[in-house]
């Protein structure tokens, strides 16, 4: 008798993946609509960075909260020192990494032959989008972790796929809105 | 827990991920013209990226648990348990990629774009399956390697794999687009 069955893995995974695809299509649709607007800029290059790194930040917080809920060091309520410290660490990490990436985009834009103002606008767009995304990451991961734990589901299986899909949509939308409307790339 | 050490560890792994994601970014920038030529391609790129991370993230986390509980031993042998895990991941890749193809066509039609269902399906399935195959094998290697090294899969394996997955997926989408024309 084997522990893993193909049938069971598929039946448990496909519904969640399907929900993720539905959420992800909104991110894709937004990108498709903005293609002409971002032509000639480096915004499309920023998409995997904001989505990927944002997703990674969510994964790390989700995995940490999942373990803490199982261990009992965090209770599914919005208070307590361990929860506050975890959120604090995530916000600091996100500010640090998004600042680092915006500096990289400043350098890439300069090397691409764009002027100082255009390069600075690229950096500004990335950091603004990152700062808009950070609360979405924290709120969605904490909410999903608590809800799934209260419902008796394993946060490890539910939180990360759904949170990364939500983060993808939020990242693509905030990046495109910031880049086109606010910074005017 | 110590906030400082969590931030430092997180930043270290994320800086490495940043450079890999930049590769994916350059690839997308290089595909910009193709996005204009193939309506609907941009729609499915993001769900395909997301899918890769989700399937391999789940595979990595199941393998991590299986290694810790001794169900799978840290050797590269195709046992029944490992085969079931790998096959399930590959079948899921295939079925979900096809789902993405159909739904992107539907979404594109609703947005009033001149989308071609056959073209989108072929690109989605080829890109999803090739990247799924490469990533599944890589996930097994990385899971066994990190387990033998004693690294924490929560903090290192998952972010690293999802980032490598992004780069592989964008590469495979580009290959599929070149193949379809």
Give residue ranges: language-model regions.
Chain A
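Alpha-helical transmembrane segments and their membrane-interface boundaries
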Residues: 1-115, 119-123, 127, 131, ...
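Short hydrophobic "helix-edge" motifs at membrane interfaces and signal-peptide entry regions
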Residues: 44-46, 142-145, 157-158
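Short alpha-helical linear motifs
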Residues: 70-71, 108-109, 144-148, 182-185
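Transmembrane alpha-helical segments of integral membrane proteins
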Residues: 136-150
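Interfacial loop-to-transmembrane junctions
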Residues: 147-168
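Juxtamembrane boundary at the C-terminal end of a transmembrane helix
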Residues: 172-185
């Amino acid at each position: 008798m084997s522990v893993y069955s193909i049938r069971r893995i598929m039946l448990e995974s496909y519904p969640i993946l399907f929900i993720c695809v539905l959420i992800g299509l909104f991110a894709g649709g937004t990108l498709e609509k903005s293609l002409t607007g971002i032509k000639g800029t480096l915004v499309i290059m920023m998409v995997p960075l904001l989505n990927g790194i944002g997703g990674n930040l969510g994964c790390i917080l989700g995995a940490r909260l999942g373990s803490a809920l199982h261990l009992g060091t965090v209770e599914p309520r919005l208070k307590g020192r361990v929860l506050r410290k975890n959120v604090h660490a995530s916000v600091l990490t996100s500010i640090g990494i998004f600042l680092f990436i915006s500096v990289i985009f400043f350098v890439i834009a300069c090397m691409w032959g764009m002027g100082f103002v255009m390069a600075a606008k690229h950096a500004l767009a990335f950091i603004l989008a990152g700062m808009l995304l950070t609360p979405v990451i924290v709120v969605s991961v904490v909410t999903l972790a608590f809800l799934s734990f209260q419902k008796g589901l394993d946060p490890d299986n539910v939180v990360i796929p759904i949170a990364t899909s939500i983060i993808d949509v939020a990242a693509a939308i905030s990046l495109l809105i910031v880049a086109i409307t606010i910074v005017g790339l | 827990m110590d906030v400082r050490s969590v931030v430092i560890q997180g930043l270290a792994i994320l800086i490495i991920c940043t450079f890999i994601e930049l590769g994916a970014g350059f690839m997308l920038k290089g595909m910009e013209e193709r996005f204009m030529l193939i309506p609907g391609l941009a729609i499915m790129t993001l769900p395909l990226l997301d899918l890769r991370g989700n399937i391999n993230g789940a595979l990595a986390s199941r393998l991590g648990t299986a290694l810790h509980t001794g169900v799978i031993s840290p050797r590269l042998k195709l046992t029944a348990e490992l085969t079931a895990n790998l096959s399930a991941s590959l079948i899921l890749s295939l079925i979900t990629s096809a789902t993405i193809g159909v739904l992107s066509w539907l979404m594109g039609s609703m947005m009033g774009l001149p989308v071609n269902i056959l073209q989108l399906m072929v690109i989605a399935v080829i890109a999803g399956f090739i990247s799924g195959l490469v990533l599944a094998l890589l996930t097994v290697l990385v899971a066994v390697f990190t387990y033998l090294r004693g690294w924490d899969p929560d903090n290192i394996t998952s972010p690293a794999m999802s980032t490598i997955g992004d780069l592989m997926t964008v590469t495979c989408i580009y290959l599929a687009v070149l193949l379809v024309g």
